[in-house]
C-alpha cells in the first residue's frame, strides 16, 4: 500500500498550465507532470469556492445539501478521510481554523495548524450577512441559532489554539514563534472573559456584536493576537531588491497601458445586462485598477503586512513528509491532505517565514529573472504569474523530496478547490462572486507510474484507490458541471438566493433563485456561448428564449432546485436549523 499525498492548490486554473512569460511557461514542472502522468484536461470542480469544494471533495455531497456547506461537512455520514482510515491509513492534514468548521478534523488522526485563528474573517464572511438582517429586524430564530453555533465553535477553536501555543503542543509546531507568550496569555485571558459573557446569554452577546461590530472587543483581541512580528531580513531584502522591483514594475505598467479598453464589451454590458449601469461602473473601476496597479513596486515594502498569514509551502511539505515517515515506522501507510493557498492574491513570491536567507534570495532572483522576460505581447497580472512560478517550484521540490524519501512508494494528487481568473485579464465587471468558466476548469494531476488510464474527475481517484466504488455520489463521467453557491460562508439557504452555474462544452448559464421560486427566463443572469465567446463578454440573456439548448439547461437546474426544496422541506436536520420563520 503506497503513501498518498493530496495537494489542493487554492485558486488554480487549468489555463495556468498554458501561460507563458516570453517564451517560458510559468508552471513548467506542473505542466510536465500533467503531460507525463494521469491528467484530466476537462476537469471541472463541483463548486467554485473553497469550503463548498472541500465538502464535495471529502464527502461526495452536493454542495448545499444538509443545510448549506457551513454545516455540510458536519452532517455528512462518511468523508474520504474516514474511508482512508478504514483502509488502514494514518490520515494527516493541516488545519486553517479561520476557514473550516472543526468538524473537518473528525476523521483526521494527526493535524497541524498553518495559521493563527482570525475571527475577523468570521465577522466579514459569516456574521456580516446576519448583521444586515438584524438591522432590518428580519433575522429569524434559526439564523440566531446558526450564529451562536458559529461563535461557540470559534471560541472553542481560538481558546484551544492559544492554550496549545502556550503548551507548545505538536499541533502548533509550525506557528509556535508567530506570537509572543505574553501576548498569547493576554489574549487568552480576554477570550475567557468574553466566553463567560457569551455563555450567560448567547443571543444578547450576538446582538452586541451586531451593534458594535467593528469596535467589538473580540476584534480588538483578534488584532492583538494576529499582530504580525516584523519578518526577519525584510529590511535587508528591501534594500537589496527594491530598485529592481520598481524597474520591473515600470516596464510592466508600460506594457499593459498600451492596450485600450474593450469598448465593445463596455457597450455590450451597458446595453444587454439587466444590471447594466452598475456592472458598467464596475468594469470601468476594474480597468482603472488594471492600469494603475503597483503590485511589484509595493511587494517588498508590504511584506510585513501581507505575509505570514500562513506557513509557507516548503515548511508544510517538509512537515508532511516527516509525519508520513513516522507513520511508516509504526507500520502504517500515510494519507496527507494539504490545502495550500500560495496561488491566491495577495500572495508571496518567496517563502517569507523560511530561515535560510540564501534560499529566499534565490527565490526572489528567479522571480525577477522571469519577470524581466515580459514583452509587448504580455497580458495578465505579473504578480499572479510570478506567484504561479513560486508555487511550481515548491511542488517540484516536494516531488523530489518524496522520491528521495519514498522511492516509488507514493502517489501524488495535485488539483484545486476552484480556479480563478487571472486578475484583471481581461478586466471584467464582476470579480467577486464571478462564475466565469475558469473558476471551474481546474487541473487534476495524479502521479502514478503503475496505471495509465485517464481520469476526468476528483472522485475517480477514490475509484483508483478502491475507496469508493459505484456510488451515486461519485460521478466519473460528467457531461456538464452544475455548481451552487449562496454567498460567502453560505450560512443558510432559507432566505438567500442560490447562484446556479451550468457549464458544458458549449454554454455557460447562470441563474439566481430563492428556494420558494422556480426557474424562468427572467431569473437568468448570464448566458454565454463559450465556443465562440471564450472571454465570456457577450451575454446572450435577452436571446435565451430563442436558444433551444438553454431550455434544456434550465430544466436541469430546476431538477436540482427541486431536490434542494425537497430536502429543505423534509429533512429533520434542515428543519432544526432553517424552517422556522
Where are these regions (language model features)?
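Catalytic domains that recognize anionic headgroups
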Residues: 1-581
Amino acid at each position: 500500500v503506497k503513501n498518498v499525498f493530496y495537494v489542493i492548490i487554492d485558486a488554480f486554473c487549468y489555463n495556468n498550465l498554458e501561460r507563458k512569460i516570453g517564451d517560458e511557461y510559468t508552471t513548467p514542472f506542473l505542466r510536465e507532470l500533467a503531460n507525463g502522468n494521469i491528467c484530466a484536461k476537462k476537469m471541472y470542480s463541483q463548486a467554485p469556492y473553497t469550503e463548498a469544494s472541500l465538502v464535495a471533495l471529502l464527502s461526495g455531497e452536493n454542495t448545499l445539501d444538509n443545510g448549506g456547506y457551513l454545516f455540510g461537512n458536519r452532517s455528512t455520514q462518511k468523508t474520504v478521510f474516514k474511508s482512508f482510515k478504514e483502509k488502514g491509513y494514518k490520515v494527516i492534514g493541516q488545519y486553517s481554523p479561520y476557514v473550516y468548521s472543526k468538524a473537518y478534523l473528525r476523521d483526521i488522526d494527526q493535524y497541524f495548524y498553518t495559521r493563527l485563528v482570525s475571527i475577523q474573517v468570521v465577522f466579514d464572511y459569516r456574521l456580516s450577512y446576519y448583521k444586515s438582517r438584524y438591522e432590518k429586524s428580519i433575522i429569524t430564530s434559526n439564523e440566531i441559532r446558526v450564529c451562536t453555533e458559529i461563535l461557540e465553535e470559534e471560541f472553542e477553536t481560538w481558546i484551544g489554539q492559544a492554550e496549545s501555543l502556550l503548551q507548545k503542543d505538536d499541533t502548533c509546531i509550525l506557528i509556535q514563534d508567530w506570537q509572543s507568550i505574553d501576548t498569547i496569555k493576554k489574549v487568552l485571558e480576554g477570550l475567557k472573559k468574553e466566553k463567560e459573557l457569551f455563555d450567560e446569554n448567547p443571543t444578547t452577546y450576538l446582538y452586541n456584536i451586531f451593534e458594535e461590530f467593528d469596535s467589538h472587543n473580540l476584534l480588538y483581541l483578534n488584532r492583538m493576537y494576529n499582530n504580525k512580528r516584523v519578518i526577519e531580513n525584510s529590511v535587508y531584502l528591501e534594500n537589496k531588491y527594491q530598485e529592481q522591483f520598481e524597474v520591473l514594475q515600470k516596464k510592466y505598467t508600460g506594457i499593459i497601458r498600451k492596450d485600450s479598453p474593450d469598448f465593445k464589451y463596455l457597450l455590450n454590458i451597458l446595453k444587454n445586462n439587466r444590471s447594466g449601469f452598475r456592472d458598467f461602473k464596475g468594469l470601468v473601476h476594474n480597468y482603472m485598477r488594471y492600469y494603475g496597479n503597483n503590485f511589484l513596486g509595493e511587494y517588498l515594502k508590504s511584506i510585513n503586512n501581507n505575509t505570514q498569514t500562513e506557513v509557507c509551502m516548503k515548511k508544510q511539505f517538509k512537515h508532511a513528509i516527516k509525519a508520513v515517515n513516522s507513520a511508516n515506522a509504526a507500520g502504517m501507510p500515510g494519507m496527507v491532505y494539504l490545502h495550500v493557498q500560495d496561488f491566491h492574491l495577495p500572495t508571496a513570491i518567496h517563502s517569507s517565514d523560511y530561515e535560510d536567507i540564501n534560499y529566499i534570495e534565490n527565490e526572489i532572483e528567479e522571480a525577477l529573472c522571469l519577470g524581466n522576460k515580459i514583452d509587448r505581447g504580455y497580458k495578465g497580472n505579473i504578480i499572479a504569474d510570478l506567484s504561479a512560478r513560486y508555487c511550481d517550484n515548491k511542488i517540484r521540490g516536494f516531488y523530489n523530496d518524496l522520491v528521495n524519501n519514498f522511492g516509488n512508494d507514493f502517489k501524488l494528487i495535485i488539483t484545486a478547490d476552484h480556479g480563478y481568473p487571472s486578475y484583471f485579464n481581461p478586466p471584467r465587471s464582476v470579480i467577486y462572486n464571478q462564475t466565469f468558466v475558469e473558476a471551474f476548469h481546474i487541473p487534476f494531476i495524479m502521479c502514478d507510474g503503475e496505471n495509465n488510464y485517464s481520469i476526468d474527475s476528483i472522485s475517480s481517484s477514490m475509484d483508483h484507490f478502491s475507496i469508493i466504488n459505484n456510488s451515486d455520489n461519485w460521478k466519473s463521467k460528467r457531461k456538464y458541471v452544475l455548481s451552487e453557491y449562496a454567498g460567502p460562508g453560505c450560512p443558510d439557504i432559507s432566505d438567500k438566493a442560490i447562484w446556479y452555474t451550468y457549464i458544458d462544452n458549449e454554454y455557460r448559464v447562470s441563474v439566481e433563485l430563492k428556494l420558494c421560486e422556480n426557474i424562468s427566463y427572467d431569473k437568468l443572469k448570464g448566458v454565454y456561448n463559450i465556443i465562440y465567446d471564450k472571454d465570456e463578454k457577450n451575454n446572450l440573456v435577452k436571446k435565451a428564449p430563442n436558444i433551444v439548448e438553454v431550455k434544456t439547461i434550465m430544466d436541469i437546474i430546476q431538477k436540482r432546485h427541486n431536490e434542494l426544496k425537497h430536502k429543505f422541506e423534509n429533512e429533520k436536520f434542515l428543519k432544526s436549523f432553517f424552517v422556522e420563520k
